[in-house]
Swiss-Prot record:
One of its GO terms (molecular function) is S-methyl-5-thioribose-1-phosphate isomerase activity. Pathway: Amino-acid biosynthesis; L-methionine biosynthesis via salvage pathway; L-methionine from S-methyl-5-thio-alpha-D-ribose 1-phosphate: step 1/6. It comes from the Bacteria. This is Methylthioribose-1-phosphate isomerase. The gene is mtnA. The active site is at D243 (proton donor). PANTHER family: METHYLTHIORIBOSE-1-PHOSPHATE ISOMERASE. It holds the Pfam family IF-2B. It comes from Roseiflexus castenholzii (strain DSM 13941 / HLO8). Keywords: Amino-acid biosynthesis, Isomerase, Methionine biosynthesis. InterPro entries: IF-2B-related (IPR000649), IF-M1Pi (IPR005251), IF_2B-like_C (IPR042529), Initiation_fac_2B_a/b/d (IPR011559), M1Pi_N (IPR027363), NagB/RpiA_transferase-like (IPR037171). Its EC number is 5.3.1.23.
Length: 354
C-alpha cells in the first residue's frame, strides 16, 4: 500500500500543500508561512476534504506556536498559548461543516495546554509533534478503512462515488477511495463511476485524476446521470466520504450526496459511507443540528472564470447536504464496518479512538 502523493506537509517551517484548485491541469505547491495563509488556503479550497483540512489546520496551529515561541521570553508560555487560541479561532471559522477542522485544532491546543508551564520552544515542538501525529494517524486510518471496506465491494466491482474522498481529501490513500484502491491492489475487478460533482467539479478534476494516476478503470458521469446508470443495473454499490457524522448516524457530505442515497434506496443498491473516527461528532444528536456552509453563488454562475448563467440569475450554493441515517447501509471506519442502528456502534468507535 502506498500513497502516490502528499496532500499537506511541513517543510522548513512552512505548511506546504497541493493547490487543488489547479488540478488536473497543473500541479502546484502552496507554501504557507502564517496562520492567515493556511486559513485562506482552507477557505478558498486550495486544500479541501475534511481529514485533509484537519491536517492543514493542525500544521497551522504548529505554525502559530513556532511564531509565538520565536518572540517569547524563556518563561512566557502564556504568549504561545494565547497565540494558539487566536489561531484556533481563525482556523475553525473557515469551513463550519467539517468537524475534523475543530477536532484537529483542539488536539494541538490541548497537547500544549497539558505541558504548560514548559518553555515556549518546548511548547512549539509539542505542537508540531501533535500535527505530525494527526497526519500519521489519518493515513493509518485510511488504510484501515480500505481493509475493512474492501469486502463490501461486490464481485463485479462497479462502484459509484461522489465528490473526492481520495488521497487529496486526506493525508493520503483516501476514505471512500480506500476500499476501491485496495480492491485494485488485490487484483480484483473494479470499475468506478465518478460523479463530476458540480459546482466545484471535485469528481471530474480530482477523483478522476487520482484514479487515472493508478490506472484504476473509471467512467466520468454528470451528477444527473447517476439514476440512469442505477436503473440500467450498472452500479453495484455507492461509496462516499463524509464531513461530519452525528450521534444518530446522519451524514453531512458534499451537496448531492443525499440525492444519491435516495436513488440508491429506490434501486436497492447498498449505500456506504467511509469516514475515520475524527469525522464523528457525538455532540450533535441528529443532522438538523449540523451547520451547512453556504458558499458564494459565483461558484455556481461561473465555471473556470467564465460566466455560464445570464446576468441577474440568482443562485444558491449550499456546499453540503445531510443524508438521514435510515438511507445509509453501513459506515466504514478504521475500527470496522458498523450497521444501523448507529448510535451505540458510533459511541464505541469514538471511545476506541480516544
Amino acid at each position: 500500500m502506498s500513497s502516490a502523493f502528499r496532500t499537506v506537509w511541513w517543510e522548513a517551517g512552512q505548511v506546504c500543500l497541493i493547490d487543488q484548485r489547479l488540478l488536473p491541469n497543473e500541479t502546484s505547491v502552496v507554501r504557507c508561512t502564517t496562520v492567515e495563509e493556511v486559513a485562506r488556503a482552507i477557505r478558498t479550497m486550495q486544500i479541501r476534504g475534511a481529514p485533509a483540512i484537519g491536517c492543514a489546520a493542525a500544521y497551522g496551529m504548529a505554525l502559530a506556536a513556532h511564531h509565538a515561541a520565536s518572540t517569547a521570553t524563556d518563561g512566557d508560555h502564556q504568549q504561545v498559548y494565547d497565540q494558539l487560541a487566536a489561531a484556533k479561532t481563525i482556523l475553525d471559522a473557515q469551513r463550519p461543516t467539517a468537524v475534523n477542522l475543530s477536532w484537529a485544532t483542539r488536539r494541538v491546543q490541548e497537547k500544549v495546554r497539558r505541558l504548560i508551564p514548559a518553555a515556549p520552544n518546548t511548547l512549539a515542538r509539542a505542537a508540531l509533534e501533535e500535527a505530525h501525529a494527526i497526519l500519521a494517524e489519518d493515513l493509518a486510518m485510511c488504510y484501515a478503512i480500505g481493509r475493512h471496506g474492501v469486502a463490501l465491494i461486490p464481485p463485479r466491482g462497479h462502484v459509484l462515488t461522489h465528490c473526492n474522498a481520495g488521497g487529496l481529501a486526506t493525508a493520503g490513500y483516501g476514505t471512500a477511495l480506500a476500499p476501491i484502491r485496495m480492491a485494485h491492489e488485490q487484483g480484483r475487478p473494479i470499475h468506478v463511476y465518478v460523479d463530476e460533482t458540480r459546482p466545484f467539479l471535485q469528481g471530474a478534476r480530482l477523483t478522476a485524476w487520482e484514479l487515472l494516476q493508478e490506472r484504476i478503470p473509471m467512467t466520468l458521469i454528470t451528477d444527473t446521470m447517476a439514476g440512469h446508470f442505477m436503473q440500467r443495473g450498472a452500479i453495484d454499490c455507492v461509496i462516499v466520504g463524509a464531513d461530519r457524522i452525528v450521534a444518530n448516524g446522519d451524514v453531512a457530505n458534499k451537496i448531492g450526496t443525499y440525492s444519491l442515497a435516495v436513488l440508491a434506496r429506490a434501486h436497492g443498491i447498498p449505500f456506504y459511507v467511509a469516514a475515520p473516527s475524527s469525522t464523528i461528532d457525538l455532540s450533535l444528536p441528529n443532522g438538523e443540528a449540523i451547520p451547512i456552509e453556504e458558499r458564494s453563488p459565483d461558484e455556481v454562475t461561473t465555471c473556470f472564470g467564465r460566466r455560464i448563467a445570464p446576468e441577474g440569475a440568482v443562485a444558491a450554493h449550499p456546499a453540503f447536504d445531510v443524508t438521514p441515517s435510515h438511507l445509509v447501509t453501513a459506515i466504514i471506519t478504521e475500527c470496522g464496518v458498523i450497521y444501523p442502528p448507529f448510535e451505540e456502534p458510533l459511541r464505541r468507535v469514538v471511545a476506541g479512538s480516544e
